[in-house]
Swiss-Prot record:
The gene is DNAJB1. InterPro entries: DnaJ_C, DnaJ_domain, DnaJ_domain_CS, DnaJ_subfamily_B, HSP40/DnaJ_pept-bd, J_dom_sf. Residues 68-90 are annotated as: Disordered. Interacts with DNAJC3. Interacts with HSF1 (via transactivation domain); this interaction results in the inhibition of heat shock- and HSF1-induced transcriptional activity during the attenuation and recovery phase period of the heat shock response. Interacts with BAG3. Its main location: cytoplasm. This is DnaJ homolog subfamily B member 1. Keywords: Chaperone, Cytoplasm, Nucleus, Phosphoprotein, Stress response. It comes from Bos taurus (Bovine). Residues 2-70 form the J domain. The keyword Transmembrane helix does not apply. GO terms for cellular component: cytosol; nucleolus; nucleoplasm. Pfam families: DnaJ, DnaJ_C. The keyword Nucleus applies. SUPFAM superfamilies: Chaperone J-domain, HSP40/DnaJ peptide-binding domain.
Amino acid sequence: MGKDYYQTLGLARGASDEEIKRAYRRQALRYHPDKNKEPGAEEKFKEIAEAYDVLSDPRKREIFDRYGEEGLKGSGPSGGSSGGTNGTSFSYTFHGDPHAMFAEFFGGRNPFDNFFGQRNGEEGMDIDDPFSGFPMGMGGFTNMNFGRSRPAQEPTRKKQDPPVTHDLRVSLEEIYSGCTKKMKISHKRLNPDGKSIRNEDKILTIEVKRGWKEGTKITFPKEGDQTSNNIPADIVFVLKDKPHNIFKRDGSDVIYPARISLREALCGCTVNVPTLDGRTIPVVFKDVIRPGMRRKVPGEGLPLPKTPEKRGDLIIEFEVIFPERIPQTSRTVLEQVLPI
């Protein structure tokens, strides 16, 4: 079952925009890592930011209300578009920095750092909401000085948000041939006035080269959320292999697990080995095959990343299936012919 963003913010469905803002304000202050040191607070803080990102956007909220998280992220009902992925791999993923969202909401990069130092021990302070005495939104802190005084003309130095990483799942066949992946993201962009923000969709195109290794990173600079206080994060996709129903990958080699009987292991056999491009190679074995033994078929693996015209090997890994019972007559024959 997918996430319930209303439950994350402690809201009922049908909550007003003002109720959503108040709920985000309350929960974000409660679980901010600078205040809440409990295990899991950082992850909860991120979940709260994602919930607010969806519910504060009318279009995302409408899709979520109709299809849930699965529909919002492109894996909803197969009969509909659930947001219109247009053939892309997903329609929505939270790419924002929860700390930047918090700063934008309250009008300061991280008010916790100095605020608690100034009000530490003050009576009547609301522990869950230390900013309860101030207005909500960008205007609440614009005329307040947190920490050491600073000349008015000194500009605030912007910092880039940390990279936002996502897995990019590809099949062995796609690594073998190379492929193109189109990933749809939704991020926030700063309007020309330098203050207001719009939501913007963008298609990121990834050319997966033949033979790329698992763990290869593809970076799209500054494609994360943009605010007046930050430099957008880089969006980074990390290549991950999809599980294959036949092969296992070992670098540029592929491993084919061959199951043979004890008789075949002792007397020899022919193994019909499939390849990634759909062919079948018959490989003859005349010697005794031991459990776990490996044999290479050279040049039938994946392309090498730096020299894709060359290929790794296809490795046959044997599993010998022993019989559960042997008739007495067969046992007698085996005792006579097998070496001690």
